[in-house]
């Protein structure tokens, strides 16, 4: 699919938002939903999506959604680093089929990385549902207990 087209209200992420499909939710508020990727590239591979609008990609995203999405991404990256101790975290956002996008509902990937692990766009095999459920619970607990106080430079 190209950058331009009609939003499909039955895409997998829209169905997850409506709870028509199960997901391993890590975080949710009025504006965003974060859940573990069912086809993870690495343990803790998290997807963050807007709960409002019908943006297929970043070009279509309402400006008011940007701050909640990227604030959530920063918080969850801190959670992933604290809980899983990766040596890096890949933050990825693809636009259009030729840009690597496979689900046409705006989303951000957070992929923990460890030394020697190859970079990739999409995993080919689903994660183990029981392991995903355990990991989602660990990350939810960390979200609930972690401080996110921001210090600003002066």
Regions found by a protein language model. Name each.
Residues 1-154:
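HIT superfamily nucleotide-processing domains
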């Amino acid at each position: 699919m190209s950058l331009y087209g009609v939003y499909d209200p039955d895409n997998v992420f829209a169905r997850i938002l409506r709870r028509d499909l199960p997901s391993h939710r890590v975080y949710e508020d009025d504006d965003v939903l974060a859940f573990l990727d069912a086809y993870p590239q690495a343990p803790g591979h998290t997807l963050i999506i807007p709960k409002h609008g019908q943006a297929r990609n970043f070009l279509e995203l309402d400006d008011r959604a940007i701050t909640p999405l990227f604030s959530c991404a920063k918080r969850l990256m801190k959670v992933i680093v604290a809980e899983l101790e990766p040596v890096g975290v890949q933050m990825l956002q693809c636009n259009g089929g030729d840009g690597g996008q496979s689900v046409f509902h705006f989303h951000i990937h957070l992929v923990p990385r460890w030394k020697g692990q190859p970079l990739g766009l999409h995993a080919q095999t689903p994660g183990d549902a029981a392991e995903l459920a355990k990991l989602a619970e660990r990350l939810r607990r960390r979200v609930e207990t972690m401080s996110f106080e921001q210090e600003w430079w002066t």
